[in-house]
Amino acid sequence: MGQAEQQKQYTPAEYFALEAQSEVRHEFFEGEVFAMAGASIAHSTIAQNFILKLRPALRGKNCRVQIEAVRLAVEENRHYTYPDVMVSCDPADQRESQQLNLPILIVEVLSPSTEAYDRGLKFNQYKKLPSLRHYLLVSQTTWLVEWYQLTEYGAWAHTALAEANDALAIPELGLAMTLAEVYEEAGVAPMKLNFGAEATGAF
């Protein structure tokens, strides 16, 4: 989460007014407003790689894929975020012009300043979204994608993808993506190479 604004509490209307005139995006939680920090090149490249795979995969499926410029209403008047990537296939979201409400997939690229938030409070809030089936936490320091998938029993199953030949496959979205494709041109080393550098004292 970014830095809280100096004003201690905002109403939802004040938050929307701030977003309409600000060049910086803000997230909102229970009256507090947080400015979002700028993304690194690796962060931005990883998000773009997901978009490049998702757009053709979703063609003809009546789904929308959006980047971090589009707001998500996690809970109206209480919690608004800007996921790095999200996909909604809900008909109600097809009519929205300012925000999405019912995503099936959310991708967050982890940053040092937001990782605890993305793993903790944010994920706990995202779990309340009735449409959400897949939540991806993507490292930007090594090849690691953590995939949380809602099972038919209502539990969230966790899968860690860290090997070069590991692949993310979400058939209902037509998505099949290897780790190499996730990290293409991002300048991020595979986990084994990172471990090797640490073991040899290389930098």
Region annotations inferred by a language model:
Residues 1-203:
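Gly/Pro/Ser/Thr-rich low-complexity, intrinsically disordered segments predominantly at protein N-termini
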